[in-house]
Amino acid sequence: MASTTIFKNFAVAVENKSLIVISNWIASDKYKSEVEEIQSLIAQGKGKEATEKKQQLPAFTPSATFKEKRLLPNLKQYSGFVHLDFDKLTPEQMDTAFKIIATIPYTFLCFRSPSGNGLKVFVEVNTGALHHDIAYKQIQLFYEEKLAIASDPKCKDITRLCFMSYHPELYKNIRNEKFIVDAPAELEVPQQVATPVTPKVDTTTQKDFETAFGVSQSQTQKQNAFNPPLSGELEGANITELLGRV
């Protein structure tokens, strides 16, 4: 199952856990007291205190695991999940949206945010990290049309965090369908054909050779002029016979 990295105070990587495990934690009482305190502060109109309390919750990166820091160069493994956030909903909007989200076969997980007035939605895709932005935009458009509610566009970042929460009645479908992303095919890198290299002629050496060859020919011609070749009758004669005739 897809894994995520859990962070403390936004920056400190604690451990990697699967989305299944995290969903079980959210459905359990693990963060119940913290989340109920946050919602109580909001009900009292203490928004600042509620925000400070929420930021103390652990958070996880739904779309990938990271090494040490939550930066793209530190990305270790893409999870294959996109995360949507529908925030600041009325109770009626919450109820209606949750029911619709649960009927969509692409929905893997949906739970209430710690504030109690938002919904977190997790959708599995058939593409990788390279097409994360494209996948997000297509899923965002699909769910916004279904719900007639706008989602938070900041969740498009692959490094985006999601706070832990408490929602015993969350929706989870381990047999979800993958959302098929209409992504452009990756371009094939053309193979480079090696160009034959023509050896460079050393013109200086060539000229020296021609000069030397010309001198050699000239000397040979001069020698032949002073020493004409033997006549046909002398060719092949014994050297002793020749000397005897002198």
Residue ranges and their predicted role:
Residues M1-S3, G80, F98-R112, P184-V246:
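Long, charged low-complexity interaction segments
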Residues A2-F10, I26, K30, L147-E210:
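Catalytic "initiation/cleavage/transfer" segments centered on a nucleophilic residue
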Residues I42-E49, I101, P105, I139-L147, ...:
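Hydrophobic, Leu/Ile/Phe/Ala-enriched alpha-helical segments that form helix-helix packing faces
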Residues K69-N74, F98-P114, A148-P153:
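Catalytic micro-motifs at enzyme active sites that drive phosphoryl/nucleotidyl and oxygen chemistry
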Residues D85-Q93:
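Short, surface-exposed ligand-recognition loops at beta-strand->loop->(often short) alpha-helix junctions
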